[in-house]
Amino acid sequence: MDKLIITGGVRLDGEIRISGAKNSALPILAATLLCDGPVTVANLPHLHDITTMIELFGRMGIEPVIDEKLSVEIDPRTIKTLVAPYELVKTMRASILVLGPMVARFGEAEVALPGGCAIGSRPVDLHIRGLEAMGAVIDVEGGYIKAKAPEGGLRGANFFFDTVSVTGTENIMMAAALARGRSVLQNAAREPEVVDLANFLIAMGAKISGAGTDTITIDGVERLHSAIYKVMPDRIETGTYLVAAAVTGGRVKVKDTDPTILEAVLEKLKEAGAEVTTGSDWIELNMHGKRPKAVNVRTAPYPAFPTDMQAQFISLNAIAEGTGAVIETIFENRFMHVYELHRMGAKIQVEGNTAIVTGTEILKGAPVMATDLRASASLVISALMAEGDTLIDRIYHIDRGYECIEEKLQMLGAKIRRVPG
């Protein structure tokens, strides 16, 4: 199992390119199953989850053609099985996204429950109830969701999401694209990745309006045609590198990104004392060698502050001037990284869904362990400005969401290297 060794204390400086968004690429890949011809998806990030989705397609009889320019061509007409097996689904919760497209296009699907996810848990329940509202008959047995469309296919429906669910919105929107009649999704997720998926579906001929608001209207069509589409930039990767620049007092320009989808994060970075300038597809952050000021953060669904940037801002507050509160309203148990940061000397107190962080001038390098994707990013950020060496174990979490992280940080001057476990 690979590890990262980071020698801290280097001020980051330079330019990097931002990769395509994993959280957009995965549903877009799933949506290719709706098409009755070949589809090309460009700007895919080279990440483990993307590889797993492509492997899932291969297991189903589809043979994606990948080129060196980060694009893939998928022709779903060669599909031979409508089963998404557990050995693949367990490694990637987003594989539930093939459920809606398969039922809508092929009339049935058998998808393993995502690993560690009981049926009573709200996110999976929303996917199932949304499809049932469209007429699907669904059984959950043996750890699999078995879904069958009614005779004549799925029917348009009005569906209200009890809680805002990004993947739930995406799954039902994809299914509705080929359903008979109109579907209206209320309390829908507003995330940019949902908008990107809607734009991809529209490029294939879907009739969708309202994406980016809490009410999405879909008028089902008989078929979706071939298209070529470029995945949006990754806003969380963008934010992560900007925070890394801020904690090291550095200057970093991120290119091939979109400032308009990261406004809540950029405002907090300005509040922390960063000079932030933007163009149509770039953001530059300059700390001028200063130590950041502590900021208060409260996570909430888009367009508010994203939960996927919470851990990074705990790392920022850990070395900032003053004390900042970070309130997590989206997920439980999302402060696992705090206990690893304690090993580096961070002063953090967790009270329920709130982390109170008192900044300290210097963190000390230490052996730490990544517990999940975004927590691992917070450890990298803290290691970049810590005194001495930090060894980060279980970095497969990082590889799920950050393309070539050590190479990109090396381009900015960081002393970071990957070593085999």
UniProtKB/Swiss-Prot annotation:
Pathway: Cell wall biogenesis; peptidoglycan biosynthesis. The keyword tRNA-binding does not apply. GO terms for cellular component: cytoplasm. CDD domains: UdpNAET. Its EC number is 2.5.1.7. It catalyses: phosphoenolpyruvate + UDP-N-acetyl-alpha-D-glucosamine = UDP-N-acetyl-3-O-(1-carboxyvinyl)-alpha-D-glucosamine + phosphate. The active site is at residue 117. One of its GO terms (molecular function) is UDP-N-acetylglucosamine 1-carboxyvinyltransferase activity. Phosphoenolpyruvate binds at residues 22-23. InterPro entries: Enolpyruvate_Tfrase_dom, Enolpyruvate_Tfrase_sf, MurA_subfamily, RNA3'P_cycl/enolpyr_Trfase_a/b, UDP_GlcNAc_COvinyl_MurA. UDP-N-acetyl-alpha-D-glucosamine binds at residues 93, 122-126, 308, 330. The modification 2-(S-cysteinyl)pyruvic acid O-phosphothioketal is found at residue 117. It is an enzyme of class 2 (transferase). It is found in: Cytoplasm. The keyword Ribosomal protein does not apply. Keywords: Cell cycle, Cell division, Cell shape, Cell wall biogenesis/degradation, Cytoplasm, Peptidoglycan synthesis, Pyruvate, Transferase. GO terms for biological process: cell division; cell wall organization; peptidoglycan biosynthetic process; regulation of cell shape; UDP-N-acetylgalactosamine biosynthetic process. Cell wall formation. Adds enolpyruvyl to UDP-N-acetylglucosamine. Belongs to the EPSP synthase family. MurA subfamily. NCBIfam families: murA, PRK09369.1. HAMAP family: MurA. This is UDP-N-acetylglucosamine 1-carboxyvinyltransferase. It comes from Pseudomonas fluorescens (strain ATCC BAA-477 / NRRL B-23932 / Pf-5).
